[in-house]
Every structure is written in structure tokens, then in C-alpha cells.
Amino acid sequence: MVLAFLVKFPMYFVHLWLPKAHVEAPVSGSIILAAVLIKLLGYGIIRLRRVTNIRIISSQIIALALIGGGILGVLCIVQRDIKVVIAYSSVVHIALVIAGRLRLTKWGFEGVLIIILAHGVCSSGIFAAANMIYERRHSRRFFFNSGLLNRRAIFRIV
């Protein structure tokens, strides 16, 4: 049952649907996906702990999640599309959620709640900012949007 949640949860080696969904979806779809749907899967993982005993395979899943998060962290550096970078970084954050929850400690649980809430607010705002950039510059590529800190003062604050 845990593995079924990990397939829907965007864990790198199991299922990599999230970046494709974010890139293809309109901005409102990306915001809803980042703010609500991924959090529902996190809630499922939190509730699932009470049903199953996952101590047997938790260390293997933690290792898999952190290795996948590291790979995607490196992939974020070489991407050229703003929405792809935001989506890959979401998968990295979800890898931390998986590792923290499967750690099976109180600190891991509290850290997961903080990451889930912060990710819901921040990633939605980042997608909205990326849409603002796209509407003004008509491109999601970093190359065409370089120098925005010099041109727009609001991006210095963000």
C-alpha cells in the first residue's frame, strides 16, 4: 500500500509525472497541483503510517528518495525552462517529505508538516511569478529572461 502512494507521490525512481504535468498544465493547474494535490498525497502518507508497519523497508525508501532528490537537484542546475526548474525542485522537496516521514520520529513528522505547508504556499507563489514573467516576456527560458533583477525592482524582493 505504501508503494502505491509512492507511485502517485512524485518520487524520482518510481514515477516522474510531476515535471511533465507542471510544464503542460496552465498556470492555474500548476498552482492547484502544487498547492493541493501533492499535499493530499502527503496527508495519505501521514495517515498510512497508522495502518501499516513500514519499518522493514523504510531505510531503503529513504535512500531511494534522497538519491533521487540529489539527482533532480543537479538536473535543476542545467534546465533552461523556468517551470521545469520549479517542478524538479518540487520533486526534491517531496523527497525530503518522504525521507522525513519514513524516519518515523516526532521530529521527522513535524518537519514534514512544515515542509508540506511551506511548499504549498511558496511553490504556488513561484508559479504565479513565473506566469507573470511569461506574460511580460513571452518566454519561459532563462536565457531570454536574464537581467530581470536590473529591470524590475519587484524581483529583487522576491
Model segments located where?
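Core, highly hydrophobic multi-pass alpha-helical transmembrane subunits of bioenergetic inner membranes
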Residues: 1-158
